[in-house]
Regions:
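Active-site-proximal helices and loops of the catalytic beta/alpha 8
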Residues: 295, 299, 303, 313, ...
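Beta-strand-rich binding/interaction modules
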Residues: 88-93, 645-662
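C-terminal beta-strand-rich structural cap/linker in extracellular carbohydrate-active enzymes
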Residues: 668-684
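Aromatic-rich carbohydrate-binding modules that target alpha-glucans
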Residues: 68-124, 130-159
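Substrate-binding/active-site clefts of carbohydrate-active enzymes
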Residues: 176-182, 190-387, 404-421, 426-432, ...
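Asparagine-centered strand-capping/turn motif at beta-strand->loop junctions
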Residues: 639-643
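N-terminal module-boundary/linker segments of secreted carbohydrate-active enzymes
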Residues: 63-78, 162-192, 382
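Ser/Thr-rich, Pro/Gly/Ala-heavy low-complexity intrinsically disordered linkers and tails
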Residues: 3, 11, 15-69, 161
């Protein structure tokens, strides 16, 4: 299907709707469940070879690109009878409110005035005729309707067509950040860089250094912001770990994990018991002024900041829990046992998942209690007001009553967005740890009332299996992405990724001899504390990981870089996947990957077609995927070869091409793509 950008009046309504919407996964280091800590056991979660009915699978050719109905349009001819007029202009709601003000000039064809324009797919249209530049008229021979303002307009019930035009949401107003342009970097603060040794912490009783604070802080993040480290990668958004104060105690894991951990990760919040506007920050990361300085420094470099917001629970030592225990679900499954997730209560079934305690020391908020909900939402809004952050990463969102999310979005609009000039879109991205059930992820996505997007776990599954592990075909990836592109809605901005803090380091899935076999969702816990893996020696692993990032950096969404993945940092499951960042002594493979990441980031930054617009597959087979991405004024060709031998990309434009990754001259329409390499072209 060919897709075209909205020209002039195109999708004013859709763009306005998007703009108006703005108007612990993770937590403890040992949790074993689908939303917190580590991937599910294969015996519990098995989406099947079909990918859970999400369009993933390859038999035959590549399925067509799927366009959502709200972006579809059909060509339609309007007519008006000639009666001596000198000019007639078609006006109406077919292009949003603007086309009532400036419509489409009609041309006379004998006894009839005619105009052909696109109308929304399957939606009723109201229209009228502006005659001789002075008078509004209807055609009495066509159906009419009286609108809410008592105006009589012509109307028709709507039109469908196949193929339809697939429009694109146009640019946002000047000064409004477009989250489609986001490239995100997850800074795991405690493991990133120690910028101020004076605030280093040590909690007695942990099972080892990897389970304790290691000195990373906000001062270290500020240092790298100032040095331009993130800008060099093409990153314009930082996600930083939970900034809340955590208790200086240890806690045991779950699921049989008897190791003792500190709260270095931030997911054991202590919240003020009396005033939700009194923000208790994590002193091991620095002062509150240091956190505010981090946000200011980032903004000065053109970088947005998200904070990880932990809203599922508090730590049992929190004074808030002592003062308001009725704001939390009792640890009682009603069957004579505890309601611990996975032990007496279900992680996934309702209502258990919205009330079970992740561990015996993490009481679960009861947001069906209005007082509890209001207190928590007010606290969240205060973090925005007092720090100036631009969004939230919503932790383990499926464990939260939806009323909390609805109220938060409403309060963000009234308390934050409405007071900005110009109003910005406050970006909220959720974490729902599910590789197969896209409907669950989608149920929390609606930029006007809920999340802007989620981390795309189902895409991660197919991406890793196709590009890194090579257990499915590149045509499978093309098929999946064609059906996934707008699955979560036209206005959603999903965050695409290959690695995060709950999965083993992804470099090991790209190795010639993969750790954990064919299971992309392995938790890697078998080597978290002993026999910890070293960095792969072969260049091939780093080339494959670069290819995975090439897919992310040349397609829609907000690509995520988990700290250290840009250098192939090794590590097994949690907590070994949270090693301290390596800043010196990089080997040649690590330098290659980091340099390639910089190049991909800059290419994405320079070409809007890679961030929005449409994708059309030229060819896709077992090892090679060639596609074009197009938006107004920009067309880019991408060829990704995951195979271990050279492949020929066909169907590229004839003549000289600029190759953007290596700068090597190329001539189309046929170009050789080296083994395990991605090439990005523009026609000269």
């Amino acid at each position: 299907m060919n897709l075209s950008r909205v020209l002039g009046i195109g999708l004013t309504t859709a763009a306005a709707a998007w703009f108006a919407s703005s108007s612990v996964a993770c937590g403890t280091d040992s949790v074993n469940n689908k939303d917190y800590g580590q991937p599910p056991d294969a015996g519990i979660f098995n989406p099947g070879s079909s990918g859970g009915g999400d369009g993933y699978g390859s038999s035959g050719g590549v399925a067509p690109f799927v366009c959502p109905d709200e972006l579809k349009a059909c060509s339609h001819e309007f007519t008006y009878p000639f009666a001596g007029e000198t000019s007639v202009e078609l006006r109406g709601d077919f292009g949003g409110p603007d086309t009532w003000q400036a419509g489409v000039p009609m041309k006379r064809d004998g006894a009839v005035w005619k105009a052909t324009t696109n109308v929304p797919f399957g939606k009723p249209v109201q229209f009228k005729f502006y005659v001789n530049g002075a008078e509004w008229k209807v055609d009495p021979a066509q159906p009419t309707v009286t609108d809410a303002s008592s105006n009589t307009n012509n109307t028709f019930a709507g039109k469908t067509c196949e193929p339809a035009v697939c429009n694109e949401i146009g640019p946002l107003p000047t000064g409004v950040f477009d989250w489609r342009d986001s490239v995100m970097y997850f800074v795991f603060v405690d493991r990133f860089l120690d910028g101020n040794g004076a605030n280093n912490c040590n909690v007695a009783g942990t099972s080892g250094p990897i389970a304790n604070y290691q000195g990373g802080d906000w001062a270290g993040v500020r240092q790298k912001i100032t040095e331009g480290y993130f800008n060099d990668l093409g990153v314009n958004t930082l996600w930083i770990t939970v900034p809340f104060n955590n208790p200086d105690v240890t806690g045991q894991g779950v699921g049989g994990d008897t190791h003792q951990y500190s709260g270095y990760h931030g997911y054991w919040p202590k919240i003020d018991a009396n005033d939700p506007a009194s923000l208790a920050h994590e002193g091991c990361f620095g002062s509150f002024a240091e956190l505010k300085g981090l946000v200011d420094d980032a903004h000065a470099k053109g970088i947005k900041v998200l904070i990880d917001y932990a809203m599922v629970h508090v730590h049992s030592s929190s004074a808030l829990f002592s003062a308001h225990s009725d704001w939390f679900w009792p640890n009682n499954n009603g069957k004579g046992g505890n309601c611990i997730c996975g032990e007496g209560c279900s992680w996934d079934a309702m209502p258990d998942r919205e009330r079970c305690w992740f561990t015996g020391y993490l009481p679960h908020w009861n947001y069906t209690n209005p007082a509890a909900r209001d207190y928590s939402v007010t606290n969240a809004v205060e973090w925005v007001k007092q720090t100036g952050v631009d969004g939230f990463r919503a932790d383990a969102i499926k464990h939260v009553d939806i009323s909390w999310l609805n109220e938060l979005r409403s309060r963000i609009k009234t308390d934050i967005t409405a007071k900005q000039t110009p109003p910005q879109r406050f970006y909220m991205v959720g974490e729902t740890y599910d590789f197969g059930n896209r409907d669950v992820l989608k149920s929390y996505v609606d930029p006007s009332t809920k999340l802007d997007g989620q981390f795309d776990f189902p895409l991660r599954k197919v991406l890793v299996e196709s590009v890194l592990m090579r257990t499915v075909k590149m045509s499978d990836l093309a098929n999946f992405m064609n059906g996934n592109e707008y699955f979560y809605g036209a206005n959603a901005v999903m965050s695409t990724f290959v690695g995060n803090h709950d999965l083993p380091r992804v470099i090991h899935l790209a190795a010639n001899s993969r750790l954990w076999g064919d299971n992309q969702a392995s938790d890697g816990k078998d080597r978290s504390w002993a026999n910890q893996p070293t960095i792969p020696a072969e260049r091939e692993a780093f080339e494959r990981l670069a290819n995975a990032f090439a897919v992310l950096m040349t397609n829609r969404g907000a690509p995520l870089i988990y700290y250290g993945d840009e250098i192939g940092l090794p590590g097994a499951g949690d907590p070994d996947n949270r090693r301290f960042m390596q800043w010196t002594g990089l080997n040649g493979n690590q330098t290659f990957l980091r340099d390639r990441m910089k190049k991909l980031g800059k290419i994405r930054e320079a070409h809007p077609a890679l961030r929005r617009g449409s994708r059309s597959t030229i060819t896709a087979d077992d090892d090679l995927w060639v596609y074009t991405r197009t938006t107004t004024g920009d067309t880019v060709y991408v060829a990704i070869n995951r195979g271990d031998g050279d492949k020929t990309a066909t169907g590229l434009p004839g003549g000289s091409l600029d190759e953007l990754v290596t700068g090597t001259p190329a001539t189309g329409p046929n170009v050789t793509i080296p083994a395990r390499q991605a090439r990005i072209f523009v026609a000269k």
